């Protein structure tokens, strides 16, 4: 039993060293690795989608989202209803400089990724989170739409270590 526990601690330590040493490098896209200048007009159209406050940016019937809390939403309305149910509204979204990347493929499909500092307002107070936001876009009949979005919570090293220890205890 003691030997198994020592093995788990060595494993956790090795994983933490690995993630701790690569976490900052992995957050910023490598310079020059991806084509981030092709289709300049499409880039402008896709970036403008983020400024729309209505559902016209979404291909509503085909939109799927995974929230940072781990819930899957099928359609923009389902996602909006979750915000209303939990009394949460976006207060601010601030991209972390140098983390945004937008890749466009064949002028018809695009994928974006960025780290965002997000503040939600709620009746219980403001909720501050840092997320890695990824989105997929498609172009239909000359217009870009968001069809998939996912927010993944960025954990501190202590939070990551705690969740790893908790996961190891389940085994």
Features from the language model and the residues they span:
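A solvent-exposed, acidic/Ser-Thr-rich amphipathic alpha-helical stretch
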Residues: 37-40, 44-45, 56-108, 127, ...
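A short hydrophobic beta-strand element
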Residues: 108-118
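Bacterial N-terminal signal peptides
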Residues: 10-23
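Short, surface-exposed coil-to-beta transition loops
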Residues: 95-98, 113-115, 128-134
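Short beta-strand edge/turn micro-motifs at domain boundaries
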Residues: 130-158
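Short, low-complexity N-terminal intrinsically disordered segments enriched in polar/charged residues
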Residues: 21, 25-58, 164-171
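A short, structured loop/turn motif at beta-sheet edges
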Residues: 102-110, 124-125, 137-143
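Bacterial N-terminal signal peptides that target proteins for export
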Residues: 2-12
């Amino acid at each position: 039993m003691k030997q198994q526990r020592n093995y788990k601690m060595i494993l956790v330590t090795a994983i933490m060293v690995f993630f701790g040493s690569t976490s900052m490098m992995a957050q910023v896209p490598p310079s020059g690795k991806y084509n981030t200048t092709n289709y300049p007009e499409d880039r402008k159209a896709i970036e403008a989608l983020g400024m729309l406050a209505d559902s016209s940016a979404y291909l509503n019937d085909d939109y799927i989202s995974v929230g940072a809390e781990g819930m899957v939403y099928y359609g923009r309305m389902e996602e909006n209803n979750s915000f209303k149910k939990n009394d949460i509204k976006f207060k601010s979204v601030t991209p972390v400089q140098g983390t945004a990347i937008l890749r466009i493929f064949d002028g018809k499909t695009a994928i974006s990724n960025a780290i965002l500092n997000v503040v939600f307002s709620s009746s219980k107070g403001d909720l501050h989170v840092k997320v890695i936001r990824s989105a997929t876009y498609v172009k239909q009949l000359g217009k870009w739409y968001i069809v998939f979005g996912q927010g993944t919570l960025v954990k501190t090293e202590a939070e990551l270590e705690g969740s790893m220890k908790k996961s190891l205890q389940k085994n």
